[in-house]
């Protein structure tokens, strides 16, 4: 069995990692991959804008630095999750992608032939739907060729 586990660095994601460890103990798991999909956009409000304004080299450099810091923070989420599996002697790999989270998760699961997607019921958005977060709900709806386990 191939398992794709989703993380966004939230407390719910930590629970998802813990439940994935339990599942790997009881199943014949061939592969575990941890995916993080970055849909965050770096805030452009830090750059002065206006009609006729051309950003200076210093402004552009500051913006590039903000982008790199953001990407580094996102990749650290994956490295922290990977460490959880390594500490439990489970081979795992990481997948970092940019895009719409639910679509990217489902597409990755389909293209790479994952048998199961494990995702938390809510993530970092802070917006709470009645039963599921918007990403987990969309993954449940869109994933047609694999099992989706939602961790509460």
Which role fits each region the language model picked out?
Residues 107-152:
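Gly/Ser-rich helix-loop-strand patches that form or flank binding pockets
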């Amino acid at each position: 069995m191939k398992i794709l586990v989703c993380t966004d660095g939230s407390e719910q994601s930590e629970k998802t990692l813990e439940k994935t460890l339990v599942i790997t103990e009881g199943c014949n798991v061939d592969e575990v991959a941890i995916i993080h999909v970055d849909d965050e956009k770096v805030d452009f409000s830090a750059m002065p804008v206006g009609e006729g304004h051309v950003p200076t080299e210093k402004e552009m450099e500051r913006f590039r630095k903000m982008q790199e810091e953001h990407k580094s923070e996102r990749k650290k989420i994956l490295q922290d999750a990977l460490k959880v599996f390594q500490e439990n002697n489970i081979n795992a790999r990481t997948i970092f992608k940019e895009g719409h989270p639910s679509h990217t998760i489902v597409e990755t699961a389909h293209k790479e032939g994952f048998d199961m997607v494990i995702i938390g019921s809510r993530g970092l958005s802070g917006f709470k739907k009645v039963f599921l977060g918007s990403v987990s709900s969309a993954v449940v709806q869109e994933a047609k060729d694999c099992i989706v386990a939602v961790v509460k």
